[in-house]
Amino acid sequence: MARIGLGVILNLAKEREPVELARSVAGILEHMFKHSEETCQRLVAAGGLDAVLYWCRRTDPALLRHCALALGNCALHGGQAAQRRMVEKRAAEWLFPLAFSKEDELLRLHACLAVAVLATNKEVEREVERSGTLALVEPLVASLDPGRFARCLVDASDTSQGRGPDDLQRLVPLLDSSRLEAQCIGAFYLCAEAAIKSLQGKTKVGVG
């Protein structure tokens, strides 16, 4: 499915307007970035990442949230090669205004997750640190309550089911990172995920 639809989506991604189309394509890219490492790297090489980074300059809340989630998925699922390309294309800098948003806590946290994951790559850690975005992670996490955040996720149509088992497994290594930012945001997401499952009456979080 991803292989068949890749060309179509990338052609649509070249159409940067109108915002309604951008919102839809960004949402599709958000999910395609976590299809597989190969798909993620092909998307990066063929312009999918460029489109997402371009849309980061927009002001539409739904579009920006898709962008933050897409960048987080790219960092989580694309491997070190994709992470290096993200940093070369200044993804950490583009994440700064998203992580600094005063109006959307979900947007801020998704952006902070993306930059924290990038910082776990030792090859690009210093470059990510210089962007200034990483410094926003700990204060944000300290200001949020996982239970309340879980309810926000459940109320949001695109995150109402929480993260799948594969996503959660990819968050676990953050807990062992030498970066405190990665540790705290990884722990926060896993706590929020447990709260989501509790709200849904499920007993298994999916990490094991």
Set out the residue ranges of the language-model regions.
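Short, hydrophobic/charged alpha-helical patches characteristic of ARM/HEAT alpha-solenoid repeats
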Residues: M1-I4, R16-L21, E38-A46, A62-L63, ...
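HEAT/HEAT-like alpha-solenoid repeats
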Residues: G7-E17, D50-R57, E93-E103, A135-A142, ...
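Alpha-helical solenoid repeat architecture
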Residues: V8-A13, R23-E37, A51-Y54, R65-G79, ...
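Helix N-cap and loop-to-helix transition residues
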Residues: P18, S36, D60, D104, ...
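A signal for specific C-terminal beta-sheet/loop modules enriched in small/flexible residues
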Residues: H31, L144-D145
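WD40 beta-propeller repeat blades
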Residues: A45, F100, H110, T120, ...
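Short intrinsically disordered, low-complexity segments
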Residues: R85-M86, L95, E123, V137
